[in-house]
Amino acid sequence: MPLTPSSTRGIPETGAIPKHIAIIMDGNGRWARKRFLPRIAGHTQGVEAVRGTIKACIERGVSHLTIFAFSSENWRRPAEEVKLLMQLFLAALEREVTGLHENGVRFRVIGDISKFDPKIVDFVQQGEALTAGNSRLNFTVAANYGGRWDIMQAVRKMITENPDSAVTFDEPDIARHLALADAPEPDLFIRTGGECRISNFLLWQLAYTELYFTDTLWPDFDASALDEAIASYRKRERRFGRTSEQIAGQQENKNTVSNEDRV
């Protein structure tokens, strides 16, 4: 599996549109509570927001979208809510995967799905197989996922593959075993719902990601909210350890070369 460029080892290519957007979809419960509805109603409406975000990402030329659907810590929630979330996850898989495939979307799940009901695991595997050849958008769902778990499982795989690596290993040795090893590191991280933390999501991959926090509750997140996040991203100066002067000089050199090419 070819590794994508590391932001701590080199300078990834960047553009006005983020190639990879990662989202923590927070605020479903509060959205429901404000409307005197059960929490599951917020999660159900949240699925609609996911569908709209996928469409908006495709229209804007985003190539990778990763959402945090269920963390390894979410098992601590009330048992009844977890049960309803699992039912909603299964229903969404049954209803959405065919549409994703018809729209050229590659679907996959990262995380320890062995903890889920076998029926969910079966639908996940079927969906991944069905959409494996698609490339219009790479849509990844993190389920029973945690950033620390991801790093630990990568280290275990690395040592199993090469026991000597336990003593002599480098960043790429771990990186190639991470859950998103074949995807570019996220350019833009979005968290809805007003909280300002990353909650054990993609700890390795977010090293140089631009972070964007919004008070918008996830069920209310739409194309215009995505555009606001991208507009904020465009204003950022992505230095990757460099100074502003270095970036300005690099841009000046690019402009000079471009002008010379026109002559």
Swiss-Prot record:
Name used for this protein in its record: Isoprenyl transferase
Top-rank EC class of the record's enzyme: transferase
InterPro entries attached to this UniProt entry: UPP_synth-like, UPP_synth-like_CS, UPP_synth-like_sf
Disordered, as annotated region: 241-263
Cofactor binding summary note: Binds 2 magnesium ions per subunit.
Residues bound to Mg(2+): D26, E210
Cofactor: Mg(2+)
Pfam families cross-referenced by the UniProt entry: Prenyltransf (PF01255)
Biological process per Gene Ontology, one example term: polyprenol biosynthetic process
Record's function text: Catalyzes the condensation of isopentenyl diphosphate (IPP) with allylic pyrophosphates generating different type of terpenoids.
List of catalytic residues: D26, N74
Positions bound to substrate: 27-31, 39, 43, 71-73, 75, 77, 191, 197-199
Keywords, sorted A to Z: Magnesium, Metal-binding, Transferase
